[in-house]
């Protein structure tokens, strides 16, 4: 394999991965906006779990398909009209990851700083306290700049599919991207 062909293949793979990642980030923002709309409509126990994929997002909820699609379209319109705050959620799993990371790193740092004088349980407690203080604001920043992207101006909600499992539905909401960004 020639070096030029190999480098071109690496570039194409990187370009493809970048597009997939960008689509997931945009769908993550729309998923958050959908949950935000559901909560604003008083469906507090409605949106339970959501996650984004390159072609849309999945929500587990007690709301029916029409309610989810309506909330998704409303949430998308909110972001498109400039309300980027709905794309950041206090309930996002990113916040849990950030809290765990801060707790672990701060516990290690405290142990290193205090050395043999330290008590492991106190280090863990201090790590937990630091995590509690900083995880929400840092989690919001990580969502804003890493795990979501609110540049969704040309995206459309394509369709929805639902499966009922007991008292819950599993909803798949499909998004469409113009200009081959999802190919």
Model-derived features: positions:
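Short Lys/Arg-enriched alpha/beta "domain-start" segment
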Residues: 6-24
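Cytosolic juxtamembrane amphipathic/interface segments immediately preceding
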Residues: 16, 20, 82-87
């Amino acid at each position: 394999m020639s070096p030029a062909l190999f480098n071109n293949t690496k570039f194409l793979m990187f370009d493809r991965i970048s597009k997939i990642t960008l689509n997931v980030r945009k769908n993550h923002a729309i998923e958050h906006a959908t949950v935000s709309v559901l909560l604003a409509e008083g469906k507090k126990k409605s949106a339970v779990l959501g996650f984004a994929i390159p072609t849309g997002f999945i929500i587990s909820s007690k709301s029916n398909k029409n309610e989810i699609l309506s909330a998704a379209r409303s949430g998308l319109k909110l972001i498109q009209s400039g309300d980027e705050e709905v794309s950041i959620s206090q309930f996002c799993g990113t916040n849990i990851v950030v809290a765990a990371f801060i707790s672990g790193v701060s516990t290690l740092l405290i142990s290193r700083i205090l050395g043999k004088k330290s008590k492991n349980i106190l280090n863990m407690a201090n790590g937990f306290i630091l995590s509690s203080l900083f995880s929400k604001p840092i989690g919001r920043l990580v969502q804003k700049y890493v795990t979501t992207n609110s540049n969704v101006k040309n995206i459309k909600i394509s369709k929805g599919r639902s499966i009922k499992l007991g008292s819950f539905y599993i909803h798949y909401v499909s998004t469409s991207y113009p200009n081959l960004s999802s190919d």
